[in-house]
Amino acid sequence: MPGSLPLNAEACWPKDVGIVALEIYFPSQYVDQAELEKYDGVDAGKYTIGLGQARMGFCTDREDINSLCLTVVQKLMERHSLSYDCIGRLEVGTETIIDKSKSVKSNLMQLFEESGNTDIEGIDTTNACYGGTAAVFNAVNWVESSSWDGRYALVVAGDIAIYATGNARPTGGVGAVALLIGPNAPLIFDRGLRGTHMQHAYDFYKPDMLSEYPVVDGKLSIQCYLSALDRCYSVYRKKIRAQWQKEGKDKDFTLNDFGFMIFHSPYCKLVQKSLARMFLNDFLNDQNRDKNSIYSGLEAFGDVKLEDTYFDRDVEKAFMKASSELFNQKTKASLLVSNQNGNMYTSSVYGSLASVLAQYSPQQLAGKRVGVFSYGSGLAATLYSLKVTQDATPGSALDKITASLCDLKSRLDSRTCVAPDVFAENMKLREDTHHLANYIPQCSIDSLFEGTWYLVRVDEKHRRTYARRPFTNDHSLDEGMGLVHSNTATEHIPSPAKKVPRLPATSAESESAVISNGEH
C-alpha cells in the first residue's frame, strides 16, 4: 500500500543517522550595529533593539562563496582528523550564485585531489535560505538508501547575505557551516517527523543576474515566514501525535515537548516573534486552554484566526510576553551567532544549532529533542526535529561535538570591528567588481583568519584561483585557529563501516597551496 512501510523496515536502516560533526566559519571582521545606526542616521535602537542585532559580519572582495566553503570544509576535516576518502557524498546548499553552470561542489573537489577520491555524489541545491536543509535531507536519505556505500555524507551550507543601501542592509551577514552526516550520530534525525510547506510567492528573490542584491517585499516576507511556520508546525504536530498514538500515548504535542527550538534567523527579533507564534498555535489548539494556567491572561484571544494575526500588534505583544520564559529556556541561546554575525541565509539555522551546542554541556543536552524550523523565500519551509543521544560520557560522540564548538564565542570575540564607512566602502567595492573578469582583488589578506581560503584572481575567462592564508604557528584548531594536518592515519571520529576499499592516507597539503577552477 502506498505510504506504508514493511514491518521489518526499521531493521534495514543504519542506526541513529544524524549529525556526527559540525564546523562553522565566519569572516574575521564585522561592523557594530549601534555604530551603523549612527552612520545611517536612523533612531538609536532601530537595528539593535528593533531587529535584535548587535554585530554584522561581512567579507571583502577576497572572499566569495567558493572560498567560504573551501574554508569550512577543510577546517572540519582538520579539526576531526578525517581522511578525504571517507566522504561518499558532498552537497552544497547556497543561494550565492557566481556561476550559472559550474557548482560550488565542483570547486570543493579540489580539496579531494590528493586523496584520489573522486567517487563522491551530490551537487548544489538552491532555494533561497532553504537549500542547506534540502541538502541535509538528501544526505540523510542517501545514508538510509540502497545507494549508501558506508561512507559519510558532507553537507555545506553557506552564503554572503548583502543588501543595497537602505532598511534591509543591517539584516545582512556572511557564514558557512559544514555538517558531517552518518550513523551512530549524537544528533539523530527523528524519522517521519517533518512538517513541510511549499508555496509560490515573490517575497524575496534575485532576478538580476548581474547583482548580488535581492528584491525584497518586507511585509510579505514576514507574512510568508509566519504562515509557513503555522503550516509546518501543524503538520509536525499531527505526525508526532500519530506516532505517539501507535505507542499508546494519547496527548497533543506542544512547545514544552521540545528541549530546544531553533529557527532560520533573518534577524533575532523575528525569531522571538516566531516562538511566540508557536505558542499561539498551542493556545488555539488546546481544547482545555481555559483550565491551563500557562495561558492565563490570554482568554480574550480564544477566537482569533491565525491568518488574521500576522500583523496584529495586540496578539503579538500578548503572546511574546506570555512565551518569554519559554523563549529564554528554549531559543535565546541559539541566537548567539545570529546576534553577533547576522543572517547567513542557508547556514543561518545551522549557526543556531552550533550556538546551542557551544553553550550547553553534554549532560544538559542529552536526551533532548531539538525542533528545527528552516525557511527559504519563494517559498520552501520545513519543521523537523533532532533527538540528542543519551550518552553524555567523556569521549562520547556528544562530548566530541560540543567540545569542537567550545571556542565559538571566543572566535566571535576575536574578530576585528570595522568602522561603518569602511564597511560601506567594501560593499561598494563588491557591487562594482563581483562580476568582473580579469580581476585581482584589492583588499589585503592580512585581515583574514589564518587558514582561510581566499580569492587570488579571476582571469579573462572568469576562472577563479584560490589560495589559503598560511598559519604562523603549527598549533591545533582545538587551541584556536591553528593547523591540524588532514588525512592523518588516526581519525578522531571513527568512519562508518567501510563497504569500499580505504585509500591510503596522504600528507597534508602545503599551507601555501594554490588551487584554481581552470587551467592557466
Curated annotation (Swiss-Prot):
This is Hydroxymethylglutaryl-CoA synthase, cytoplasmic. One of its GO terms (molecular function) is protein homodimerization activity. InterPro entries: HMG_CoA_synt_AS, HMG_CoA_synt_C_dom, HMG_CoA_synth_N, HMG_CoA_synthase_euk, Thiolase-like. Homodimer. Residues 507-520 have a biased composition (Polar residues). Belongs to the thiolase-like superfamily. HMG-CoA synthase family. (3S)-3-hydroxy-3-methylglutaryl-CoA binds at D43, A44, C129, N167, T171, S221, H264, K273, N343, S377. The keyword Metal-binding does not apply.
